[in-house]
């Protein structure tokens, strides 16, 4: 798979899963390979399904989501970006959450726009392109 144009944050994948207005249409209109999710996002989605009162239904929905939105693994380049971003944010005294840090590093390493409705958190990361499809 070539680098995706968009890396979808957990909140956007949840909005897709829940069929929130505008999100499914936007994702479904993309060409194959234009959007993906980080394995970190996938882990957060699996955790949500594990904790769900409707576990089996949640996992069935996640299976369908994964068929549409591929999951990208982490490689050395992501680790390089993670270290650089974390160092920059710690020096500035503006850290972000650990999973968000990995997701930001993954998007930046892929040269993909991170699609999130949590732009306030991610705008601290230099060189990270952001899009909010919920507004």
Could you describe each region identified by the protein language model?
Residues 13-14, 24, 43-46, 72, ...:
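Nucleotide phosphate-binding site architecture
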Residues 2-4, 69-115:
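Active-site neighborhoods of divalent-metal-dependent phosphate/nucleic-acid chemistry enzymes
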Residues 12-13, 41, 78, 102-103, ...:
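Alpha-helix capping/helix-boundary segments
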Residues 1-38, 47-64, 91:
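Short, well-structured N-terminal submotif of metal-dependent ribonuclease cores
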Residues 39-40, 75, 134:
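Residues at the C-termini of beta-strands that transition into short coil/loop
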Residues 9-10, 45, 82, 107, ...:
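Generic structural signal for small/hydrophobic residues in well-ordered secondary structure
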Residues 1-4, 120, 130-135:
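Short, C-terminally biased terminal segments at protein or domain edges
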